[in-house]
């Protein structure tokens, strides 16, 4: 739209979005004359003013994500023109604007790596409880136990330490110290778009971006105030349990401009009973942004982001038994009550004439956390009664204990030669008879209750307190919270400078982060992280984009560890250099080929290195020798836009290769409670008991050696316009990954040579594959809109899990069970047969139907896991059953 006031030498006006009528700040307005190109940019209110030489000129209005508009004008001396311009968003998906790749705005078609993009409308339709509900529908992205993995880069780490960095407006939401992702901190009520970058991103963003990057961009206020309210309620179906667990949430957000201020505030409350017993999540979060655009200096703004979260939740580690998969094992029940707060001051200055931008960011972070654990709620009487124990058997037990040489030794001694030869079936059969004699109805879950009860009642009684101990033993166990609160503090500074040239962009910057953790989980530890980075992007012949970058990083934990270390001319330097490079070439109209190479690394978090805690009976054990993992990612990709009548979209195919050194993985098994040694032999087992150190069940982070992951990522997105009122949007993706343990042959040979009765293996089979990965994944999202109605579906199929921990499952064929088989049966029930029957791949489908009741109010009903499939990506963790959701939202 153009309006003419009169003619003259000055041209001015306002620039708005053609649909929303919101002012567009930062629009490039320019024209060419004999002296070159002259131009300006619009301010926060969309206002521009430009001096134009006499005569004819063509004004060009250019803004990323919008169609470029050219307007011819005729200028007479001594007069002026007013041009109010409305720009339309670019309907081409490949012209979408992203910022994650180069820390500045680029077209999706110009970037040199693979990226997926989700807009706010796509996210709201999913009615997510948090961002994980959205990410699981993206091709190449998996979420296991709330831990994201891009193209098989991560297995199962129980949420601690992440190879995928999560950002909100450029700042990390990984919890300092532990490296876990706090999904509850992400303001879902105010998300504008989510960018998922596939591949190493350590050059610009540092550690934890080894496998990829997920960047959440929040909305900014327009000219008119906007208030959004969203209410949702969910009802879990009944898989095989009593009761009907519920969840519900409320989102509120408000944004507006007040003179030179931008104000955004948001709040969320969420209560989830969980579909598994004692697996709940309760949160309250409030936050906001205040930005001041200084009228005295064009391009200068500064302000602050604030966020506070109260969270009370429990995790789910392992089940009670295959018959009770939605009930936690009494040995694995842990929760947290947390108060998390951060404040992020910032300052941005852009000089449009010089093409330079300065960005300063800071953060103060604090988390107070209390771990809540309990073993079993049952009393000793309850447990033994369930096991069929007869109180009249007590004298018999006492007699056996006092006269074990005559009562027990003759029964078990004959099996000693078999045991020495590695056969334990006869001995275990006799022990089974003895157990069945006293506990005729006992199950594996009952034995776990008994073990859990004993762990919760230690120390055992002596002759002076037997009576009091027995009275207390008849009482059920209760949840206990530690007296002390764990505290984690973080201080962060980030500076970025960018210079835009005619055909290139230079970005340089530096970061500093200080973390201090005072915790019962890890003890007291501090870390320092200092880095500087540089990236240069250049466009050649209007078709070729080339990008190169480097990062230097220093990291230290306490005073004794330098995780980032490099040899230069034989000398060790406490700095880790990381390089990346990429190119994108436009073959033809909407046809692009790209190639990229990026190094990455990730130093272990304080928690991974020093963790020592009980997960309600199951422990987590430290590994002070844990080293930083490093690797690189290479990719060759092709993107092609297409248009056939009313159908338009693009197809993207990429081949990728990732290699790791000193890869950090989660090892589950038995450990010495004091030395933290991994128990992989009878001698270590006996030493743990004879020394009084004790034995623990749990996990430890360890470096597993070399690994490589390669495959193909194929996806397509598009829209078919049936008519003015009807359209179908779709996204389809297939990913093939081949996750290889490069040291598998030597490791298998070493493990095969160990004939100890307690010999442990690294994983559940002798295959070449890494643990907790799948080879094939197919995902699809479809949404049909007709007038004010919409109907949509998500579909996902994944092939079987290739390998898991040996301590959980042994898939090898044996002539007879070994000692570990009997131990697994007692701990986890008949998990072997359950896993063999159910680990065959799975298909999950969600459905949704919605309607716009009025212009500002919409209602939507959803059914997740429509077919009520029971599925698992890892043993003893069953996915949610069929879930019914109602969502009501309003904008005004």
Role assignments for model-derived ranges:
Residues 503-515, 519, 523-659:
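Structural signature of Gram-negative outer-membrane beta-barrels, strongest in the C-terminal barrel
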Residues 115, 132-171, 175:
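Extracytoplasmic beta-strand/coil segments of soluble accessory domains associated
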Residues 359-363, 367-373, 586, 592-596, ...:
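Membrane-embedded beta-barrel scaffold of Gram-negative outer-membrane proteins
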Residues 230, 541-542, 656-659, 678-807:
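Gram-negative outer-membrane beta-barrel transporters
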Residues 185-230:
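A beta-strand signature from Gram-negative outer-membrane beta-barrel systems
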Residues 272-283, 291-293, 297-354, 358, ...:
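Flexible loop and strand-edge segments within Gram-negative outer membrane beta-barrel domains
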């Amino acid at each position: 739209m153009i309006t003419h006031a009169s003619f003259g030498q000055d041209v001015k006006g306002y620039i708005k979005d053609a649909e929303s009528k919101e002012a567009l700040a930062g629009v490039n307005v320019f024209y060419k004359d004999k002296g070159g190109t002259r131009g300006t940019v619009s301010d926060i209110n969309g206002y521009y003013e430009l001096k134009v030489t006499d005569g004819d000129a063509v004004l060009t209005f250019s803004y990323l994500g919008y169609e470029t508009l050219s307007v011819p004008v005729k200028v007479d001396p001594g007069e002026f023109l007013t041009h109010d311009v409305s720009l339309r968003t670019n309907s081409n998906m490949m012209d979408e604007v992203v910022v994650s790749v180069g820390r500045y705005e680029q077209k999706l078609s110009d970037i040199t790596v693979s990226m997926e993009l989700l807009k706010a409308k796509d996210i709201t339709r999913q009615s997510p409880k948090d961002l994980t509900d959205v990410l699981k529908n993206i091709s190449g992205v998996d979420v296991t136990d709330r831990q994201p993995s891009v193209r098989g880069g991560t297995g199962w780490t129980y949420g601690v330490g992440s190879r995928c960095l999560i950002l909100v407006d450029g700042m990390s939401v990984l919890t300092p110290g532990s490296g876990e992702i706090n999904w509850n901190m992400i303001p879902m009520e105010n998300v504008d778009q989510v960018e998922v970058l596939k591949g190493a991103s350590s050059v610009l963003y540092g550690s934890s971006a080894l496998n990829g990057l997920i960047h959440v961009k929040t909305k900014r206020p327009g000219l008119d105030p906007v208030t959004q309210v969203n209410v949702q309620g969910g009802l879990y179906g009944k898989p095989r349990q009593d009761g009907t667990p519920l969840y519900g949430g409320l989102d509120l957000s408000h944004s507006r401009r007040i003179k030179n201020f931008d104000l955004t505030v948001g709040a969320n409350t969420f209560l989830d009973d969980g579909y598994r017993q004692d697996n709940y999540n309760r949160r309250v979060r409030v936050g906001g942004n205040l930005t001041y655009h200084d009228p005295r200096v064009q391009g200068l703004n500064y302000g602050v982001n604030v966020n506070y979260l109260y969270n009370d939740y429990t995790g789910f580690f392992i089940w009670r038994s295959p018959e009770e998969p939605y009930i936690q094992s009494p040995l694995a029940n842990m929760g947290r009550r947390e108060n998390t707060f951060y404040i992020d001051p910032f300052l941005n200055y852009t000089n449009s004439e010089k093409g330079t931008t300065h960005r300063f960011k800071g953060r103060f972070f604090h988390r107070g956390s209390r771990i809540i654990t309990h073993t079993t709620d049952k009393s000793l009487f309850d447990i033994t009664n369930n096991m069929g124990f007869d109180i009249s058997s007590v004298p018999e037990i006492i007699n056996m204990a006092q006269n074990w040489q005559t009562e027990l030794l003759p029964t078990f001694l004959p099996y000693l030669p078999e045991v020495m030869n590695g056969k334990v079936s006869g001995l275990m059969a006799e022990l089974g008879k003895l157990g069945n004699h006293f506990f005729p109805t006992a199950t594996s879950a009952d034995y776990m209750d008994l073990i859990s009860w004993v762990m919760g009642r230690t120390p055992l009684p002596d002759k002076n307190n037997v009576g009091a101990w027995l009275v207390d033993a008849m009482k059920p166990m209760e949840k206990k919270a530690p007296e002390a609160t764990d505290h984690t503090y973080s201080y962060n500074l980030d500076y970025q400078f960018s210079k835009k040239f005619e055909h290139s962009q230079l970005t340089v910057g530096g970061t500093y982060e200080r973390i201090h953790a005072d915790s019962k989980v890890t003890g007291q530890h501090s870390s320092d992280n200092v880095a500087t980075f540089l990236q240069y992007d250049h466009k050649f012949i209007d078709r070729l984009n080339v990008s190169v970058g480097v990062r230097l990083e220093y990291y230290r934990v306490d005073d004794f560890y330098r995780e980032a270390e490099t040899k230069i001319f034989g000398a060790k330097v406490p700095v880790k250099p990381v390089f990346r490079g990429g190119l994108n070439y436009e073959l033809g109209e909407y046809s692009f080929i790209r190639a990229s190479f990026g190094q990455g690394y990730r130093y272990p978090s304080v928690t991974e290195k020093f963790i020592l805690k009980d997960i309600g009976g199951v422990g987590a054990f430290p590994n002070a020798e844990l080293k930083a993992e490093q690797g690189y990612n290479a990719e060759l990709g092709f993107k092609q836009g297409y248009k056939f009548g009313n159908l338009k979209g693009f197809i993207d195919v990429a081949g990728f290769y990732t290699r790791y050194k000193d890869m950090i993985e989660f090892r589950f098994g038995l450990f010495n409670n004091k030395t933290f040694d991994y128990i992989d032999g009878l001698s270590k087992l006996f030493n743990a008991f004879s020394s009084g150190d004790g034995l623990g069940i749990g996990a430890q982070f360890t470096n597993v050696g070399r690994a490589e992951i390669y495959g193909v990522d194929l996806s397509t997105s598009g829209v078919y316009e049936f008519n003015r009122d009807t359209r179908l949007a779709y996204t389809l993706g297939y990913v093939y990954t081949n996750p290889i343990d490069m040291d598998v042959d030597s490791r298998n040979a070493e493990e095969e040579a160990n004939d100890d009765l307690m010999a442990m293996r690294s994983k559940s089979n002798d295959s070449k594959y890494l643990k907790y990965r799948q080879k094939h994944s197919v995902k699809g999202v479809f949404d049909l809109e007709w007038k004010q109605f919409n109907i949509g579906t998500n579909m996902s199929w994944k092939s079987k899990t290739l390998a898991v921990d040996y301590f959980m499952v042994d898939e090898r064929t044996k002539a007879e069970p070994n000692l570990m088989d009997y131990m697994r049966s007692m701990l986890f029930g008949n998990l072997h047969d359950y896993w063999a029957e159910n680990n065959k791949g799975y298909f999950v489908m969600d459905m949704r139907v919605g309607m716009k009741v009025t212009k500002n109010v919409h209602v939507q009903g959803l059914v997740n896991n429509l077919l009520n499939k029971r599925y698992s990506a890892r043993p003893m963790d069953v996915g949610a059953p069929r879930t019914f959701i109602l969502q009501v939202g309003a904008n005004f």
